[in-house]
Amino acid sequence: MAYSYSEKKRIRKSFGKRPQVLNVPYLLTIQLDSYEKFIHRDLDGQQGLEAAFRSVFPIVSNNGSTELQYVSYELGEPVFDVRECQIRGTTYAAPLRVKLRLVAFDREAAAGTVKDIKEQNVYMGEIPLMTDNGTFVINGTERVIVSQLHRSPGVFFDSDKGKTHSSGKVLYNARIIPYRGSWLDFEFDPKDNLYARIDRRRKLPATIILRALGYTTEEILTMFFEKVLFEIQDNKLLMILVPERLRGETAAFDIEANGKIYVERGRRITARHIRTLEKDGITQIEVPVEYIVGKVAAKDYVDLSTGELVCPANTEISMDMLAKLSQAGYKELEVLFTNDLDHGPYISETLRVDSTYDRLSALVEIYRMMRPGEPPTKEAAEALFDNMFFSADRYDLSAVGRMKFNRSLNIPEGVGTGILTNDDITGVMKKLIEIRNGRGEVDDIDHLGNRRIRSVGEMAENQFRIGLVRVERAVRERLSLGDLDGITPQDLINAKPISAAVKEFFGSSQLSQFMDQNNPLSEVTHKRRISALGPGGLTRERAGFEVRDVHPTHYGRLCPIETPEGPNIGLINSLSVYARTNNYGFLETPFHKVVNGQVTEEIEYLSAIEEGNYVVAQANSNLDEHFRFTDTYVTCRGEHGESGLYKPEDIHYMDISTQQVVSVAAALIPFLEHDDANRALMGANMQRQAVPTLRADKPLVGTGMEKPIALDSGVAIVAKRGGIIQRVDASRIVVKVNEDETIPGEAGIDIYNLIKYTRSNQNTCINQIPCVNLGEPVARGEILADGPSTDLGELALGQNIRVAFMPWNGYNFEDSMLVSERVVQEDRFTTIHIQELSCVARDTKLGAEEITADIPNVGESALSKLDESGIVYVGAEVKGGDILVGKVTPKGETQLTPEEKLLRAIFGEKASDVKDSSLRVPNGTSGTVIDVQVFTRDSVEKDKRALEIEEMQLREAKKDLTEELEILEAGLFTRVRNLLIESGVSEVNLNNVAREKWLEQTLDDEAKQNQLEQLAEQHEELCKEFERKLEIKRNKIIQGDDLAPGVLKVVKVYLAVRRQIQPGDKMAGRHGNKGVISKINPVEDMPYDENGEPVEIVLNPLGVPSRMNIGQILETHLGLAARGIGDQINAMIKQQQEVTKLREYIQKAYDLGHGSQVVDLSTFTDEEVMRLAQNLRKGLPLATPVFDGAHEAEIKGLLELGGLPTSGQITLFDGRTGEKFERPVTVGYMYMLKLNHLVDDKMHARSTGSYSLVTQQPLGGKAQFGGQRFGEMEVWALEAYGAAYTLQEMLTVKSDDVNGRTKMYKNIVDGTHQMEPGMPESFNVLLKEIRALGIDMELDED
């Protein structure tokens, strides 16, 4: 494999046996593609804004004289860029302008004659734009819209599994779910009558729906039943025989024909009997007259002579009726064919329950059910029913719904529209009856073929459409008022409802979430999250086990591991690594096609529906060098997701990769295959909580997924085009682009500005550090600068720590850990947290609040860190209680005492009519001020500090743009110089002339002269562009800020807090092995090995066996080997051994094992080998892919190569006594994470605080400044000890005895240490509650 310059800096050795055929796809595709489809104009009108506009427009007035037509739309440019929106607290959005046409028709002339046309661009609010990383900036905060997994539109057949009725009878139902519109349900009741419900309302007999569709009783019976024909001949009754129908029946009479008895009375009719009847060609048999009694007539029988209805359809035939029919001259009778086995009389029975008799009565019944209390009219009833299922405005199955509907009912694809037809409804009822009759199966609603993904674009389109529909009503009313002279489309349209709908969705929808920005992995995972909750989805309380469970169709689509613990388990999932959505919104996953046992290179994506029809082999099946299966039988997933053994020639597809099952976070866990699933779940979830450390450290033992995640997360800077690094400093990287990648006529310079010390949503620090040097070549897509938690373009969430598994004086009891002081000294787990504190000056009733350094009753020392405007200076180190922004608020006039009047007279007015409301540092926080922002309302004069900040921003902007111009000019003038030298101008002359003069030269060669003129034009354009950009920047900086009503000024202060690791902080590995630090131990007391190397963390070995996460042990062994090889390389470098030996040793390490990766160091120059060796000194980075990882022999081989014992265990010595521990200990390197559960954020101390209003007990929690709850178990403990007085004060004066605690405070102040406990307030509450029940309780006083 050929490596690029920057890839050669550090190569991760992979143990993967399977070659990676398909690169990991771009991880944010699901977000970006979906929103792209929403915003970009789709000329077919199938999706996005275009579809929304076309579904609502044209809007026609009620009298048809005018209509408002939609022509096209365009999105403008956003006013501020993403960064500016975050600073200013505004939404990153673009204005939407729609071209509308108002057409007025001439009512006197022929229909369709146009009288007047007005066309105009109408502003329709702002549409939030997605940033490059798949997020939205709403009101200054980054948010993510999580995709939703909802029930696909279509028809579903289900059963209650016998839970509804006490008899345990299984009741079947069918539900037609449209994308938009009313639901239609059909269900059986315990008596086997078929009922219908509309929108889950009161149930009606299903035949009412059929009558409302215009069917008569006779037509209904013909549609749902087969007929049996009886003939009356010479007072005999003959039945036309269809032998197959008799199967399973018990003969009620001797079945005989031509004198031969085929079945005796009372015998069951078997398949043998039927075959005999068919062989003998028996087509009719004589039946006793009683046999027809009780059968149901299939149609109306009328006495033609009198016109009397002798036997209505769906009536049981009696002897009297039979006589009448015979008299009326009927020779043939049609009855319904039913039996108990597989032709139930359900519709016939339902018709008897149905009280309606024709279409109108059915429509009236439906109207009464839908609109109770309203008097029905014929027109209203018809309009209601038609609008419900047959109007494209009110009902839409959508393309997905129609596809699912047709598949379910075996209708050819492409037939039908978004609305229902009579055949659709009858088809559903027929299939439901078939299922009840025992033919056909119910659907599995948890199958991923029945659940689809609804992503950002689709949800935004639905919200936008809701807004448009609201506008439509208003426009139609306005058009119908007449008098449209001089009215333009802009006058008709009010954009507020549209903006409101969009704003509500992005701002407060359940699926619009505050982005989890702890680290790059948490960002990526949040964007790939799939939630079953949210509008139109499930609710936590109603979701049962089945929905939450892992389903066979999740394979390769949704991760079976990564889901939250707690009430949301199984409802929130994560997309698997290779999964994507298809056009219908169903999840697909890639497979290799297999032909005759030969795995081909062809890759196909299959959805869950398609995969069910094939046999799929696993990715780790054994193949020979020609990619043929070597085993006689291969373990595969067969039809319906069941696993079994299959022959190679029966296999259709093979998995693409071993990590295709799991999500991005689970794919980061090395040796996942050796961890228990519950612990793997915790490991995947805890990686998302890791805080970026001060210096990122790549994992020694990884899985190879670290690079794609870091690249796709967007936290690092990636080269857009290849080139050479021309300039690099802490805040900017400049790349001179390769000639073959430049566009003709451009300067060929790419400038990347780095993000420095910015606050994330979780208050962690976002900072980018260049990882390239001057003059280095870079290729397109390579990393230029590392972001938080990335190291040379690889995800680095924690630190490689030397761990030992052994008990140590009880300090690692119950998952706690003992940490060496060295870890603290080296700042291994030091993190920077940035807090934003804001101070708002408002206009109050008593006057405006003022930000000032002149604060009453505050000493000089407290003001020492403020400037003259009353705002803290940047760089100040502050601690809890310090003033950051001085602010005074006017207070109301009060009556003054004579003393106060005197003081006022002496010290002047100011002192008393304002109170101090300054912004102070919260208690328990200390840090450094790293930035201050001042926002001022337009009408308010800017203070000195605001002007200083403005000037500084202007200077910065000008400096940035000037530098940019200089770089671009330098590139341009280099090309001019080369051109002039080629044309014969001497270098000496050029050096003596100012660069601008070069462009005025005239050349003999016409082509070169043209080139020179082009370059001169470009130079002019560059200067103009510079001026334009500067002007825009200047205007943005100078203009006033758009603040909330009543707000005059906002000051934001950013504090950087440096947090070292300390006891009480939570740490974890990647295998769900979490714990809390119990003690920071001096280095000299830590156990050490025979080389004097102390361990850094001591873990409890008892945390492993019961938890079954053995992956951590294997990781420790492999980590030790990786570090051992690093140490060997380090020793060789220190001994200054020659490069060939170094090359040989490193090559040996890369060649070890049976991995498919090939690293050929012979293609590297000596310099490149040395650079690689320098980067490997701290250990050889290894990749052990999920389910395809390192084997025991490979781990032992590496340990041997590193000169370490192959057992992975080392003799340790006690640091305090120097004695040897009695047995060898497992020591190695484990990747440890510091989680965002820091003791500093959790611990607080309550002094005088707030009390609950009713119970008068202290509140709980840090946010409420609450106390510790003394719960019932604690009370039992004190009771058990007999500590009566302690218990008494706990339950009274220290809690809710109001008078007692007041007296006690007074006593302490007076110095008398006594207490008088009284009645706790909670007892009074109990008394009141008992009285509320009407029971009077009185307390006797002794």
Swiss-Prot record:
The keyword Transcription applies. GO terms for cellular component: DNA-directed RNA polymerase complex. InterPro entries: DNA-dir_RNA_pol_bsu_ext_1_sf, DNA-dir_RNA_pol_bsu_external_1, DNA-dir_RNA_pol_su2, DNA-dir_RNAP_su2_dom, DNA-dir_RNAP_su2_hyb_sf, RNA_pol_bsu_bac, RNA_pol_bsu_CS, RNA_pol_bsu_protrusion. One of its GO terms (biological process) is DNA-templated transcription. The keyword tRNA-binding does not apply. It comes from the Bacteria. GO terms for molecular function: DNA binding; DNA-directed RNA polymerase activity; ribonucleoside binding. Its EC number is 2.7.7.6. Keywords: DNA-directed RNA polymerase, Nucleotidyltransferase, Transcription, Transferase. Pfam families: RNA_pol_Rpb2_1, RNA_pol_Rpb2_2, RNA_pol_Rpb2_3, RNA_pol_Rpb2_45, RNA_pol_Rpb2_6, RNA_pol_Rpb2_7. It catalyses: RNA(n) + a ribonucleoside 5'-triphosphate = RNA(n+1) + diphosphate. The RNAP catalytic core consists of 2 alpha, 1 beta, 1 beta' and 1 omega subunit. When a sigma factor is associated with the core the holoenzyme is formed, which can initiate transcription. DNA-dependent RNA polymerase catalyzes the transcription of DNA into RNA using the four ribonucleoside triphosphates as substrates. PANTHER family: DNA-DIRECTED RNA POLYMERASE I SUBUNIT 2. Belongs to the RNA polymerase beta chain family. This is DNA-directed RNA polymerase subunit beta. It comes from Haemophilus ducreyi (strain 35000HP / ATCC 700724).
